[in-house]
Amino acid sequence: MYTKKYSQDIKINNPDKYNLSENIIWSSPHGFDLTMDIYSPKNISVHCPVVVMFHGGGFLIRRKEILNNMAQYIASNHDYIVCNVNYRLLRDQSNTVLFNDLIGDAFGSILWIKENIHKYNGDKEKIGITGDSAGAYICAMILNLGNKIGKKEDFEKDYAFEPTYLPENLSFCLLYTSPSPRDRVR
């Protein structure tokens, strides 16, 4: 009984509470448009914290749309900006996308958000990331990469992730991780 009443009190999607900016192209690696949807609360005068969402799908299937209900729920019931992000899948671009590429896409989206979220009334200093399945793994990689930013000469024997998006005032950025027995996942 309690569950039924509780679910009646929560509105999963109330578009009157948020603005939706759909399919914003934030980068186009090799002509492949990467998009995100941004949900921003209406009638909020302060900069809101940001939730960035990465979808699952085993790095091979699905797109950001599978998290639309979750994004709508957060936007309808909380004062957060929600960024629902697409990244390239391994099967995209005629199966030429490497695992490092999609991690670079995800990290690039965070850099884009930090540079642009103020336009949507978001606080670039308060960004949280979440994901389901493969998206959760991507979140773990992003958090790990943040500890490995450095100069190229410090990591010459390691593999590099290159973010898909770089802010205009940043001319070079490589993110390094230690070598893996596999540099390509199929």
Predicted regions and their residues:
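Short mixed-charge
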Residues: K148-S171
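Conserved small/polar residues in nucleotide/adenosyl-binding loops
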Residues: Y176-D183
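Residue in the alpha/beta-hydrolase core beta-strand immediately N-terminal to the catalytic nucleophile
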Residues: K126-G128
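N-terminal cap/lid segment of alpha/beta-hydrolase-fold proteins
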Residues: T3-S45
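Gly/Ala-rich beta-loop-alpha elbow adjacent to hydrolase catalytic centers
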Residues: G131, G135
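Short beta-strand element of the alpha/beta-hydrolase
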Residues: H47-G56
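Catalytic nucleophile-loop/oxyanion-hole region of alpha/beta-hydrolase
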Residues: R63-K64, M70-A71, C83-K124
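Short glycine-enriched nucleophile-adjacent loop
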Residues: A136-K148
